[in-house]
Amino acid sequence: MKIKMNNAVGPQVRTAKPKPSKLLPVLGAASMVGGLQAATQFFAHTFAYHATLGPNVGHVYAPWSILHWTYKWYSQYPDEIMKAGSMGMLVSTVGLLGVAVAKVVTSNSSKANEYLHGSARWAEKKDIQAAGLLPRERNVLEIVTGKAAPTATGVYVGGWQDKDGNFFYLRHSGPEHVLTYAPTRSGKGVGLVVPTLLSWGASSVITDLKGELWALTAGWRQKHAKNKVLRFEPASTSGGVCWNPLDEIRLGTEYEVGDVQNLATLIVDPDGKGLDSHWQKTAFALLVGVILHALYKAKDDGGTATLPSVDAMLADPNRDIGELWMEMATYGHVDGQNHHAIGSAARDMMDRPEEEAGSVLSTAKSYLALYRDPVVARNVSRSDFRIKQLMHEDDPVSLYIVTQPNDKARLRPLVRVMVNMIVRLLADKMDFEGGRPVAHYKHRLLMMLDEFPSLGKLEIMQESLAFVAGYGIKCYLICQDINQLKSRETGYGHDESITSNCHVQNAYPPNRVETAEHLSRLTGQTTVVKEQITTSGRRTAAMLGQVSRTYQEVQRPLLTPDECLRMPGPKKNAQGEIEEAGDMVIYVAGYPAIYGKQPLYFKDPVFSARAAIPAPKVSDRLRAVAQADTEGEGITI
């Protein structure tokens, strides 16, 4: 049995195997027919094409006529028939020998393997359509009925220019997440963020540095996308909404302790580095008890518990701190009985030595110092909306989280609390019908998180990317480079899973080699043919003695790191404003990489008109529900 070598790699594994060539069998059959034709014509020529031989066309007879003549006249003309047969055998033999030689030559010839060292290539239009970033062409039924092909929807992930210079927007409408690498001042806002927010009609959460996105997109989203637009700017008095994180605690249910523990973790770990020190861990335990105590006491007094009130409770100058521990340990929180989590936290503080207890208290108060700012305290004193309303309100809701550059660092703990609660509270349950999940929300939610790593490590975000798409949440994460994401100090570390859970990745020309190397690996390896010319002969001779050319298949990255670094960026004027788009690359899992073109919203008259709609001067406010979501059974002591 002949052993067949397995040279299939890459796409060849899934492609249909080529069928054996039928050329040589056809040539062999033609040789046999040619022999019959030669014998027939030789015999007819011998008898001067006599009419008795039968019908012909220009003295040309059917090839099989010699067989009929042999049966009919062999006894009368044996010599003539033998001569005709010899002529036919000669012609057939020559033809079959030629076929045999061709078979030997083709069998001993090597077959080129264009995927030997890699099969990476740039995507063509059909690849981009298959990836879902371009609308498909109209089918036959749509052409006959005059219907248009489905239009593209979803978020903008880039642009693409065909060979004729036609520009197409690339949009992704699936539930999968998007990760963007774009250095500062590279045009990601005018190319990706603004077009997306000027076309996405469902709910959204937007981190907005300096309020630029609010100014450019809130007007259209409110007036034409029929969104309720909320501006949450904790350090401003300019008419934004207020939000109290403690209103989201599901007080009186079995979830209350977990909710408060999640909140306290974010308070004492503002950078997402983990609770490593003894003081962080003890301050965390203390804050869990104090926050729960403040919630129950405010409920009984008919007031509202807030983070500023928690800070005031710990820093009350007119009350000895020991009185607070005693109150927490004896207060009847639930049905006249003391809450076990609150009492335990108070007894821990009473059992500690005075010096240690003072250090724990000081650590806890230091994490609440942000809420001593009267502006911030006012903006977290009540709730003009609830997290659940982002996806469950009758109208879609757009929440802009606005921070000014000079307040960005100090407000980060509060922003982290909000993002954490959005993910945790909106991805809490899933309904099924007929073995399939069904949407329990009214509107999908887009989380447009610009400068995502600047929020610090949000472990819930990293873990939840794998499943929040099933709850109608689509994340669009933007970072400056791969180092910012993989940093061990401020990011998610080398073994992060953010990139693993983002189906689409796109990138503007990077500034760091590490990002360029990452993009080069994403693009893949390809096979190219290298030509080598060898010459021989005397240097002083008029002509060289011999010139030989050899061809070799070699491997190279489809996009090398230095080529990635040298991708054309956007062209800017003297004022630093972008005038012409640069290049970019887009990666969709399972499809060839796309060498694209950056979109610019101000080059599109539709987007320019939408961006010109003035933003509302005052934020919308939603109807605040009377109590936090109390799903679940009440707890008992």
UniProtKB/Swiss-Prot annotation:
GO terms for cellular component: plasma membrane. It is found in: Cell inner membrane. InterPro entries: P-loop_NTPase (IPR027417), T4SS-coupling_protein (IPR051539), TraG/VirD4 (IPR003688). Keywords: Cell inner membrane, Cell membrane, Conjugation, DNA-binding, Membrane, Plasmid, Transmembrane, Transmembrane helix. Residues 1-22, 106-637 are cytoplasmic. Belongs to the VirD4/TraG family. This is Conjugal transfer protein TraG. It comes from the Bacteria. Residues 44-84 are periplasmic. It is a multi-pass membrane protein. CDD domains: TrwB_TraG_TraD_VirD4. Required for conjugative transfer of plasmid R751. Binds tightly and specifically to the relaxase TraI. Can also bind to DNA without sequence specificity. May form a pore-like structure that could serve as a channel for DNA transfer. It holds the Pfam family T4SS-DNA_transf. The lineage of its organism: Bacteria, Pseudomonadati, Pseudomonadota, Gammaproteobacteria, Enterobacterales. The chain crosses the membrane at residues 23-43, 85-105. GO terms for molecular function: DNA binding. May form multimers of at least 18 subunits.
